Swiss-Prot record:
Keywords, ordered alphabetically: Aromatic hydrocarbons catabolism, NAD, Oxidoreductase
BP terms from Gene Ontology: 3-phenylpropionate catabolic process
EC top class, as a word: oxidoreductase
Name of the protein in its database record: Acetaldehyde dehydrogenase
Pfam families reported for this sequence: AcetDehyd-dimer, Semialdhyde_dh
Catalytic residues of the enzyme: 131 (acyl-thioester intermediate)
Gene: mhpF
GO terms for MF: acetaldehyde dehydrogenase (acetylating) activity; NAD binding
Pathway: Aromatic compound metabolism; 3-phenylpropanoate degradation
Catalytic reactions of this protein: acetaldehyde + NAD(+) + CoA = acetyl-CoA + NADH + H(+)
Record EC number: 1.2.1.10
Known partners and oligomeric status: Interacts with MhpE.
Alphabetical list of CDD domains matching this protein: ALDH_C
């Protein structure tokens, strides 16, 4: 099967790590162009050293390159505002081009590979939510397939050192996009997301806490569902793991808790603690937050490439 050529817009931490993953591990993908806006960026310099074509003139520079004619999939690792403009420009030049959005822009549907990749594989634009969303939404979905989830809250703690200018510029969009995706993909009636930039030295690994309030159900069934989901995520993010056993608390009907936007709740509270260790392809091992984004985007693109190849075969 011939590989599909891809371009990455954004030569920062995420874009560079993703490029290295594609060059080393791409099964159905061929790294064609790295796009940036800073001619002095380390990402563009590294791409050139690795034999990848580059431009420092942004999406316009990409569209003016001869390589653009053969590109089927574009990853956007810029910012939410920039992605809206990039999508419009690329769509006008190539209506059928596939975009994988690693910003919180969310023009297309949210995609969390282990939960809903199959139903989104033929979309022209998919959004990879956020690092916190990729880590925690599978856990919410794991509870949702056993019991009705009324509320889910996630706290993502990431090393301050791993948060580049793009991440910092998108903090508000991070919380909004993650909260919405907890509902749309995770299956919660109400979702809430909090991000913490931890300045500790040496930097700590990404840690995530997930609280899920659901109807009462078998605790064994919920724990089994969570463990099964964690294994599925590990297939494309090897450093993803449960930090400790799942914990439960029954909230009795005569002592309900009051949830903003939900009302009074009684039922089962499930608490999950996660840790994500990065693969250290370009970034340090503590930057699991960036690794889970690039790994999820890579898994999505691989499936898209297979789908495009099948369609090309059917049309031939």
């Amino acid at each position: 099967m011939s590989k599909r050529k891809v371009a990455i817009i954004g030569s920062g931490n995420i874009g560079t790590d993703l490029m290295i993953k594609i060059l080393r591990h791409g099964q159905h993908l061929e790294m064609a162009v790295m796009v940036g806006i800073d001619p002095q960026s380390d990402g563009l310099a590294r791409a050139r050293r690795m034999g990848v074509a580059t431009t420092h003139e942004g999406v316009i520079g990409l569209m003016n390159m001869p390589e653009f004619a053969d590109i089927d999939i574009v990853f956007d690792a810029t910012s939410a505002g920039a992605h809206v403009k990039n999508d419009a420009a690329l769509r006008e030049a190539k209506p059928d081009i596939r975009l994988i959005d690693l910003t919180p822009a969310a023009i297309g549907p949210y995609c969390v590979p282990v939960v809903n990749l199959e139903e989104n594989v033929d979309q022209l634009n998919v959004n990879m939510v956020t690092c916190g969303g990729q880590a925690t939404i599978p856990m919410v979905a794991a509870v949702s397939r056993v019991a009705r989830v009324h509320y889910a809250e996630i706290i993502a703690s990431i090393a301050s050192k791993s948060a580049g200018p793009g991440t910092r510029a998108n903090i508000d969009e991070f919380t909004e996009t993650t909260s919405r995706a907890i509902e749309v993909v995770g299956g919660a009636a109400k979702g809430k997301a909090i991000i913490v930039l931890n300045p500790a030295e040496p930097p700590l690994m990404m840690r995530d806490t997930v609280y899920v309030l659901s109807d009462e159900a078998s605790q064994d069934d919920i724990e089994a569902s969570i463990n099964e989901m964690a294994e599925a995520v590990q297939a494309y993010v090897p450093g993803y793991r449960l930090k400790q056993r799942v914990q439960f608390e029954v909230i009795p009907q005569d002592k309900p808790v009051n949830l903003p936007g939900v009302g009074q709740f009684s039922g089962l509270k499930t608490a999950v603690w996660l840790e994500v260790e990065g693969a250290a392809h370009y970034l340090s091992a503590y930057a699991g937050n960036l690794d889970i984004m690039t790994s999820s985007a890579l898994a999505t693109a691989e499936k898209m490439a297979q789908s495009l190849a099948r369609k090309a075969g059917e049309a031939a």
